[in-house]
């Protein structure tokens, strides 16, 4: 049921969004957990996950993006659409709910979405986003733990193929040194 997540969408995306929703509702545990969390948010007063608009707009300057004010995921073309990128944009929409006014802090948001997707992929035996994360705009931001290592350097030093749960927990301990308003709600729960 597309109405569970989407308010509106470009008609050419209908079949792809149907496949995406089928996967989210019936796929791996991580995908079902995201849907369950969205349902939880919508049942509580903690925040409201607004249904997304998913549009194709050839005038976009990038292949895809999440536009917060309109709660819209834009793809430049049908060829730019992928379930993986839509999944990440849904993570951004959830971050907006969890962080409220703080969600646009660039140090945190893009890297955190990659880390969440990496962790969910790891749990399900898949590959991660390490290479994608290395190329992101804010990858040069310094970790806020008194070390001079950048996010890119940390990822390279701890390449996805070498990471295990203990490595993620170690990084999480560093992540928790970031001021409280920027901490990752979902990942901090996972480490407890």
Q: Each predicted region: which residue ranges?
A:
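Active-site or metal-binding loop neighborhoods of secreted/extracellular toxin and effector enzymes
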Residues: 1-25, 103-192
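Extended amphipathic alpha-helical coiled-coil/heptad-repeat regions
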Residues: 26-33, 37-46
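Substrate-binding clefts and substrate-entry loops adjacent to catalytic sites
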Residues: 69-76, 94-104
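Active-site recognition of the HExxH zinc-binding catalytic motif
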Residues: 84-97
């Amino acid at each position: 049921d597309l109405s569970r997540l989407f308010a509106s969408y470009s008609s050419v995306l209908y079949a792809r969004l149907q496949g995406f929703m089928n996967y989210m509702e019936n796929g791996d545990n991580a995908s079902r957990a995201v849907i369950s969390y969205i349902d939880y948010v919508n049942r509580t007063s903690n925040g409201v996950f607004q249904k997304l608009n998913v549009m194709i707009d050839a005038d976009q300057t990038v292949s895809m993006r999440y536009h917060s004010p309109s709660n819209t995921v834009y793809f430049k073309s049908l060829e730019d659409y992928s379930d993986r990128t839509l999944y990440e944009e849904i993570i951004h929409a959830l971050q907006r709910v969890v962080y409220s006014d703080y969600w646009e802090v660039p140090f945190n948001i893009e890297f955190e979405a990659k880390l969440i997707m990496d962790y969910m992929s790891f749990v399900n035996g898949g590959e991660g986003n390490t290479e994608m994360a290395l190329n992101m705009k804010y990858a040069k931001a310094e970790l806020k733990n008194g070390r001079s290592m950048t996010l890119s350097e940390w990822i390279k030093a701890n390449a996805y193929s070498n990471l295990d749960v203990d490595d993620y927990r170690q990084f999480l301990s560093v992540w928790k040194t970031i001021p409280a308003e920027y901490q990752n709600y979902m990942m901090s729960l996972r480490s407890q």
